[in-house]
C-alpha cells in the first residue's frame, strides 16, 4: 500500500512539472495552395499571383481616353464615311474600340487593299495631325470636284461621299491629265489614302472621265504602282454595280508622293501625320465606356492589378499581366495551417512531433509555450520569424519581378486570303500560351514546396536549439515539448528562449530528480510484477479447488465413476 501511494504521489508531481514547448503559428485561414506533392494544402498566409477579375468597363488608359468608333470601323473612320461624322475631329486616343456591329466602313463597295496591315500600323499610333494634303479649292482647277457623290454614301437622305477623299470627274467634256505632288515636311510619317474607281460599263467610264483608256499612277521613293480601270458588269452592292478599291501608303519625312491620272482617281483630300512610339491597339468590345482610369485594358473590362498573371483575356492594352490559362496561382508565404499531426513535406521536418499550430501565438511564425508555477504563455521567436519573413518576402518579390513583364498584346490582323496563315499563327500563339502556363504553374508548385519545407526546417532548428541547451536537464515528451527535471521560473524560461540557458546551474537538481523518478519507476515495476505473480497463483488455486469440488459431487451421486486398475 505504501508503494502504491508513493507511485500516485510521484505521478501527481510529474504532472505539475515545468514544461516548455516549441511550436508554430496557426490561424483561421482557409487559403489553400498546391505543391509538387500535394493539392489544396491549407496555409496560414499566401499571396495570389493570378488576376481573374475585371470591372466590366472600358476606361481611359493612364488618363487618356479611348476612341470609341461606335457603329463605324477603322476604314469608315479614316476614309470619312458620312455615317462617321462624329469622328471627324478625333485626333488622339489611348486605344481604339470597335464593336461587334461596327458596320459602317467603305460605303461605296470595293476592296480596301492591305487593310489588316493598316490596322496593325495603328497599334503604334496614339494621335495624328489631320491636314489638307491637296486643298479642294485650289488643287484641281481643270477638273470637277463637287459632282463626285453617290447614293451609296448618302447623308441625311442625300447623295454624298467620303469626307477625306475627293471623287474627281471631268469638267465639261474633258478630263485633262492631272499631276499633283506632295512633299512631307511634317517631321513624321504621313498616312495617305486614295482610291481607284472601276465603272461597270464603258458608257459610265466616258460619262464620268471622258477618257476610255484612263490610268492612275502613284509613286514615291518606296511606293510605285500604276492602275487601270477594270470595266466589267458586276452584281449590285448597296445599289452600285461599280467598285472602288482603296489604297494607302506611309510617306517618310522629306519624301514626295506624286499622283498622275487621266481618269478614275479618287484623290486624297486629307492626310494624317502620325505620332508613333506608344502602345495603342484596336480591340473589339461591346462593354460600355466609363469615366474611369486604368493601366491595363481588356475587351471584357479594365484590370487594376500589379499581379504578374491574369486569365481574363489574351488581348490586352497597356501595362498588363501575362495571360495564362491557369485558374489558380497562389504562392505560400506562411506555414501549413495544421490542426493535427500529418505529413509535412519533403523533409518531414515536424511530422509526428508537433501536434498542431497555436492560434494563441499571434506575434510570430515560430515560438514557445511555457508552463511553470508562475503561469503559462506564448512567446514568438522574433529572430527566426523575421529572418523567414525577409527571405520569403524577397523570394516572392523576385518571382513577381521576373514574371511581371507587362505589355500590350493585341490581336494580329489577317485578311480573308490569309486564313491558313492565321490558323498557323493561332497554333503558334496557343503553343506559347501553353508553355507560359506550364512554366507559371511549375514555378508556383516548386516554390510552394520549398516554402513549406523551409518553415518545417526552421521549426526543427528551433527545437534542436532548445534540445542542445537543456540536454539531460529535461525530458523530451515527443510532441515538441520538454519537461524539466528542475524548477524553471520565468527567468529560466527566458534564458532558454534567448539561448543563454545555464546548464551547469541546474544540473545537480536535475540529476537528483531524474534519479528519484527513475527509482520510482523501477520500484513500481517490482510491485506490479509481484501483484501479477500473486494474481496468477491465486487464480490457479481457485480453479483447482473448483474442479475438485465438482469431481467429488459427481462421484457421490454416481454421475462419475472412478476405477483403479492394477
UniProtKB/Swiss-Prot annotation:
GO MF term set: host cell surface receptor binding
UniProt membrane topology term: Single-pass type I membrane protein
Lipid attachment residues per UniProt (S-palmitoyl cysteine): 555, 562, 565
Transmembrane feature ranges: 530-550
GO CC list: host cell plasma membrane; membrane; viral envelope; virion membrane
S-S bridge residues: 21-481, 59-292, 72-84, 107-153, 296-320, 488-492
Glycan-carrying positions: 27-28, 40, 104, 304, 498
Coiled-coil region list: none
Compartments in which it is found: Virion membrane; Host apical cell membrane
Keywords, ordered alphabetically: Clathrin- and caveolin-independent endocytosis of virus by host, Clathrin-mediated endocytosis of virus by host, Disulfide bond, Fusion of virus membrane with host endosomal membrane, Fusion of virus membrane with host membrane, Glycoprotein, Hemagglutinin, Host cell membrane, Host membrane, Host-virus interaction, Lipoprotein, Membrane, Palmitate, Signal, Transmembrane, Transmembrane helix, Viral attachment to host cell, Viral envelope protein, Viral penetration into host cytoplasm, Virion, Virus endocytosis by host, Virus entry into host cell
Family membership: Belongs to the influenza viruses hemagglutinin family.
Subunit structure comment from the entry: Homotrimer of disulfide-linked HA1-HA2. Interacts with human CACNA1C.
Purpose: Binds to sialic acid-containing receptors on the cell surface, bringing about the attachment of the virus particle to the cell. This attachment induces virion internalization either through clathrin-dependent endocytosis or through clathrin- and caveolin-independent pathway. Plays a major role in the determination of host range restriction and virulence. Class I viral fusion protein. Responsible for penetration of the virus into the cell cytoplasm by mediating the fusion of the membrane of the endocytosed virus particle with the endosomal membrane.
Protein name, UniProt field: Hemagglutinin
Name of the gene this protein is made from: HA
